[in-house]
Amino acid sequence: MCNYQLTDFLPTTKKECELRGWGQLDVILFSGDAYVDHPSFGAAVIGRMLEANGYRVAIVPQPDWHGDYRDFKKLGRPRLFFAVSPGAMDSMVNRYTANRRMRHDDAYTPDGRHGMRPDYPSIVYSKILKQLFPDVPVVLGGIEASLRRLTHYDYWEDKLKKCILCESGADIILYGMGEKNTLQLCRELENGRSIKDVKDIPQTVYLAKKEDIPGGITDTDIVLHSHEECLRNKKAQAENFRHIEEESNKMHAQRLIQGVDHQFAVVNPPYPPMTTEELDAAFDLPYTRMPHPKYKGKTIPAYEMIKFSVNLHRGCFGGCAFCTISAHQGKFVVCRSKESIMREVKQVIAMPDFKGYLSDLGGPSANMYGMHGRNPKACERCRRPSCINPQICPNLVTDHSKLLDIYHAVDALPGIKKSFIGSGVRYDLLLHKSKDEKSNEAARQYTRELITRHVSGRLKVAPEHTSDRVLRLMRKPSFSQFYDFKRIFDRINREEGLNQQIIPYFISSHPGCKEEDMAELAVLTKNLDFHLEQVQDFTPTPMTVSTETWYTGYDPYTLEPVSSAKTPREKLAQRQFFFWYKPEERASIERELRRIGRPDLISKLYDGVHYHGRAHYDPKAIGSSPERTDMREKKRKSFNPNFQPRGFGTVSYTHLRAHETTLHL
């Protein structure tokens, strides 16, 4: 049993600092999340990393931004800087739905309580700190600032906004995964440099006059259209984004410079991908893997979801158009060593309430562990946003052998009854036929072992749509591959006597998607016996190609016009097709099908049965009715008692996938 003392956690109060014998702190970190001392929570990662390098660091979780600002004053003035992060998710995604309605809960807050963070904490916290301590540097990190490092469209305010440094008053952004740039900034300031002079650290963003940019603006820099020009011309914003995304995905990027408010936002290129040893060091820090004792007796939903999970790698080369993982973690997959993974699994086994079931052995995508470019030189020249779309790159090693070895080693540990894969699986990697037969055999073995040993009753996959035209805009594989994978899934279930479900995720109102596409999606998924549950409206979030397409009306790569559903009526007209099986939706769906000239789909959806105001539930359909779902759960051969079918709260699944495994300042 783990018996942790208060001093085993990073301090959050003056008293806790005194218990450690600390006077002035070096860095004070303000976070929009509750403090959970776990490698899936960015404040803990950065805090532990600084602690390991000899710095005195404290965390102020979810400070009260009202009244006299006592939470911002209580730890005094740090020696080096204040660090500000909104938390593991974009604060606006966390607080609002795709329809801009306020959510009623917050998964990163004790007991899911709503209202413990403001809109845009990066801005609110920074302004307060600058008001109270104008001469102390304020450093922004985390997903919110990272994805707002240049001119970006803000869906919640429905306007184009400047680099977040302009509005927040902060001094610098440490974008992406924050271990290296944060530590380097500490060393530079400790050596006596002023924050205004620190302009050479990779993976940082700062504001400067033209004459103050180191080396001046050179031919190797990419000078983007200014913020003011983007306000006048949406096509300029679309053109900008192609450069921004390409430089985010390159091994050796160029410096980006954008004019704004008579100065320039300068984005220094990122560090090279971390090594396995560097990633191990981040995960091997002395985390307690528990919420701070101040939350005793309370439940933090996000922690409950991942407390028995282990992250295997960072980065994702999928390049999905609506996802921010590659923009924040990078395109190149960096894997932990087997030894580091096994150490963490043993820590989980030692947890007092662990019952033998690992809820996830995964990452941003479950089955990219160990995959890399066969020829590293080709990767160094590559600027593709995806290694697997529109086709899988011939240079990509898609061998699942290393991942299988991890699974086997984990499952062989005493105390492990089952390890489940809760992260999304890329079935296009499983179906890929490479020239290496060993790799093909490993993919077949992985597929069978995944289904027979690692599915907690339901396997999550993300086809996202059925229209190949829409899927091309999403950078997702053809829906025909989902058919192929489902046939394999069903066959293995029959052979093994299992009764598992495959749960597909879909998005409506994505740029380029029309009502007719959604109507055909309804027919195709009906024919596959699905009554869809895991669905959502597309939510534009900063720094995705889908968002730029949605806002500008142009594909950033081709500059061809792309239409999008934007008004509530247009979005509802698409979303209703997910729920064709609900009696209250039928009349509206039939009206819409007649309006768009597709009355032929009415008989396909409803089998020619006249509408009598009552739903027809197919007993074979997944999610057909609550009674059917309960019955299946009782019959499951591989039932996971930790499984939470609805995720946590009402946070949209796309953004959970984007952020739930990120570790950042």
Regions flagged by a language model, labelled:
Residues 90-99, 147-149, 179-184, 209-213, ...:
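Flexible glycine/acidic-rich beta-alpha junction loops that bind and position SAM and/or redox cofactors
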Residues 329-354:
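Conserved alpha-helical substructure of the radical SAM core
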Residues 29, 45, 59, 65-68, ...:
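Conserved SAM/AdoMet-binding glycine-rich loop
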Residues 30-35, 296-324, 342, 357:
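N-terminal pre-triad scaffold of radical SAM enzymes
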Residues 459, 463, 501-503, 508-595, ...:
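Flexible, glycine-rich loop/tail regions that form catalytic "lids" or insertion modules at the edges
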Residues 42, 61-260, 267-268, 272:
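Glycine-rich beta-alpha loop elements in corrinoid/cobalamin-binding modules
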Residues 2-24, 34, 239-309:
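N-terminal [4Fe-4S]-dependent radical SAM core
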Residues 654-661:
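Conserved small/polar residues in nucleotide/adenosyl-binding loops
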